[in-house]
Amino acid sequence: MKKLLKVTAMTGSLTLVKMLMGFIIAKVVAIYTGPSGMAMLGQIQSVVTSLNGLVNAPTSNGIIKYTAEFSPKGTEACAPWWRAAVHWALVISILAIAITISFSTMLSGWLFDNTEYAWLLILCACSLPLVTLGTLLTSIINGKQQYRQYIKVGMFSTLVTAGVMVYMVIRYGIQGALVAAALQNAIVGIAMLALNFRQPWFNFNNFWGRVERKYLSGLGNYILMAVTTALTVPISFIFVRNEIIANTSWVDAGQWQAVWRISETYLSVLTIALGTYYLPKLATLTSRSEMQMEIINTLKVVIPFAILSAGAVFFFRDLVIKILFTDEFKGARDLFLVQLCGDVVKIISWVIAYPMLSNAKTKLYIFSEIFFSLTLVLFTQYFVRQLGVQGANYAYLT
């Protein structure tokens, strides 16, 4: 528990910067695009999350685990895993780019009710190699538990991407917001390359070369889990927005997206700490009892924090809306209570689900992701038609 608190404190500055930048971006988007623009931005962000999840499948959790596990033996022990990740990432990137470009017109119609944004989806696809590069480097730093370097590069990337987003929104309105959302993770990839190419482990031979089958297959379960998440969770939220739009309006979808954005922002305090400390820590544990103890100790920190944070957001929701958005978003105040209850349940489920990633419990993880996404869509269809936009939050809590 002490280590988790220490890492949480260490990542506090990064978390605060990310929260601040998230608030600034939300305010700028609200002013220059309104609720309907917020909903459109949410749609493209879900696409970006899905595509990024696909290409990052080989370079994220599996690399964190194996880097943490083999780092004590030196870079030479980690390099085969890194090379395997690069091979997988190249194959998945080529497939993702080809499929997205081929179906860009159809996807644009599904997301935005018109085909004018096919070019935006092509832009998302073409940026994917840089995205997976950034994730690979971040995962290596995380796996090595180089927390200071992790915070440094995270801070720089956050400031750069936020600056690009704000400039594009102010200069070009909703079009600029959509382009910035499509490219921000590629910008992170460039920043990660610039900040890490002098690291002693950053050597071409560590990332490219012959790979034994056992390393490729060793990442296989992590790839299956990540691909499942990429193809279920973000796409389920697209279905949720489409259901809200079909039964209410783009404005209501934007109100819902605003509340969701607030949840994402304050929960980032925990997600950064868990991603930085919890997963690498689980990878080093060898016994069932040690893992159970780690889960219990983590929950002792996470549950009170989640409840207190959700309570603070609820009681100050009017002030939050006033600061972060505009008067057009006042209707969002009625959406907070159920959403925040769902957030508490969600963060607890994260703590419980992380051991599945650490131990590559593929079947259980895949089932849980598909089950969550499917029930979210089905409950949303039912509740939104009965209760309007509030129904989406009841579906999330359920």
Report the location of each language-model feature.
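Interhelical loop/hinge segments that connect adjacent transmembrane helices in multipass membrane
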Residues: 1-4, 181, 193-235, 280, ...
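C-terminal transmembrane helix end/exit motif
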Residues: 28, 63, 138-143, 147, ...
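Hydrophobic alpha-helical transmembrane segments
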Residues: 118, 122, 152-200, 371-375, ...
